[in-house]
Amino acid sequence: MSAVEQPPVYKIALGIEYDGSKYYGWQRQNEVRSVQEKLEKALSQVANEPVNVFCAGRTDAGVHGTGQVVHFETTALRKDAAWTLGVNANLPGDIAVRWVKAVPEDFHARFSATARRYRYIIYNHRLRPAILGHGVTHFYEPLDAERMHRAAQCLIGENDFTSFRAVQCQSRTPWRNVMHINVTRHGAYVVVDIKANAFVHHMVRNIVGSLMEVGAHNQPESWIAELLAAKDRRLSAATAKAEGLYLVAVDYPERFDLPKTPLGPLFLAD
């Protein structure tokens, strides 16, 4: 008796955008809303079989993504439009597929990634915003963006980020390699743009929290370098809120030839 022939398995990568303000983070959890759960449900409807996704970076509750990357495996052969338009039709309005690409067997959304890039958006005005209030962090004291930028440059390179690491972080090492960190002002908005090979838990938000203290002239420019050298989380500022944080890009080796989309969010140029 001949063995039953198994259907071929396809590996698919997707670019995902989402407003995380109504979700308890990316990762699927029991009895709470997660981005992963909504995406897997929509994909399973299109594939007509259960689908599990793996992401490049598991964002926390309230954090957004314009450049999240996921992959999944399926025996369902579908046109690209099914994985984009079809999946989007089954997703809530605050989650969307941006692109689709068939990938080789050795691709992994998390482990194949070589760098992640985040942007943190601060609405720097005396009064809080009503529009996009869950997409920015409001800070009412005047911020000196140029001062923040200068102070942040000491973080570039491979460093021990213990001072900017959440106490509950489960990473085996606090060492990370920061490729760039830029702070710029766009009218009432201050944008912190940071790229690294990977990030320890709450690293971006802890860095931003301390940079805001420097920008408000509550601490000297040298304070960030002092915190980095101290390797003590208790000395740095409070963690900045989740609302202003966006995962905007994930880098992969060129051989995977993944699509490039505008980083955003919204009007922000690349």
Swiss-Prot record:
GO terms for biological process: tRNA pseudouridine synthesis. Its EC number is 5.4.99.12. GO terms for molecular function: RNA binding; tRNA pseudouridine(38-40) synthase activity. Substrate binds at Y118. CDD domains: PseudoU_synth_EcTruA (cd02570). Keywords: Isomerase, tRNA processing. Residues 107-111 are annotated as: RNA binding. Homodimer. This is tRNA pseudouridine synthase A.
